[in-house]
Structure formats: C-alpha cells, structure tokens
Amino acid sequence: MRSKPSGRKRVVVIVHEVRGVTENLVRLASFLTSEGFAVVLPSLYSDGFVGSDEHASYRKFYSEVGIERALMAIGDIIEEHVGAKISLLGFSVGATVAWLLSGNGKIDSAIGFYGSRIRNHLDIQPSADVDLYFCREKGFDVEETIGTLNAKRNVSAALIPGEHGFYSTSPFASPQIERANRLILTSLKR
C-alpha cells in the first residue's frame, strides 16, 4: 500500500512484524493517510505472506527475509523518498529494522513497538529522533534495556501495558491499539 506524498508531506514507512502486512496494519495505514501523512506499507515477503501463527511466521521470516534483506528493502524505500521527511514505524522485527536505520542520517524519526531484539543492538547511536515502546517480556530485562536507551541522545523509551505482538492480535478498536495510535500520532506530529 502506498499513498502519494505531495510537497513536503511526511512519509511514514510502516515496517511489519514477522506476521506480514496484517489487517490492522492496513487499517493503521488508512488511518495515518486520513491524518494527512503519505504512507508506504510494503510486504517484505515476496509472496505477500500474512501469518496467524507466530512461530511459523517467525521461521518463515528468518528463512525467507531476515534482517539484512529487510534493511535493504526499507533502505531502498528511503532512497525513493530522498528530500521528504521520512519516519519509520516498526513493530517487533520491524521496530528493530527501524532502530538499525535510525543512525543512517536519512530519516527524521523512528517509532518502534515491542522491538525486543533492539537489546542486541544497543551500540546504535541514532541521528533521528526515536520513540520506542516495549511490553514486558520473559526473555530479558526490559527495564534495563529502557534505561540504557534513555541514556542515548535523541531516544525516548518507555514500558507500555500489553503483550508482544498486540498490534497484530488485538481488535483494531481495542484500548491497546487506540493508545498505540495516539502515541504514533504524537510522535509523527512533533
């Protein structure tokens, strides 16, 4: 899905999680377009895969796409919009991709939700403004990661209620997604 940028309109590139371009992400793209943003919502899967099972989706993502290909694909989209204000909006692995690209000097901002793998890339120093939102996770100390991130220039990290993957698994009108959409709009309108 792509809406055309006009003038200096901010371009929002939504980077999906391992489940692919879910119905909720399509609805988010429509919502952001109605708010005046140009939106790009690419599928990183060559077959347009949308998965309902997290574990199967995870295996498919890492066997067919992987972080490096995702970085190249999103990097190509960034290059297509040079001169525009560009924001990356990522979920899970998409948040990690947004984080990894936040220091490239080519984007204005990045927003990430439940990007748990960001903890493996704390050496990144963003040149863009970055807002990161984490949910509690069993596999690592989220609060320690948030503290490390908040010590960096241009980064705001926070713990929000919810579970990893809520944007794909909750109803679009749920309080969690409505809260996330408010956070997204606040970041994009800054």
Residue ranges and their predicted role:
Residues 89-94, 98:
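Gly/Ala-rich beta-loop-alpha elbow adjacent to hydrolase catalytic centers
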Residues 106-117:
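A conserved short beta-strand
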Residues 28, 140-149:
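Short alpha-helix in the alpha/beta-hydrolase fold that links the catalytic acid
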Residues 43-47, 116, 163:
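Short beta-to-alpha linker loops that shape the active-site pocket of alpha/beta-hydrolase fold enzymes
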Residues 155-190:
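C-terminal catalytic histidine-bearing segment of alpha/beta-hydrolase fold enzymes
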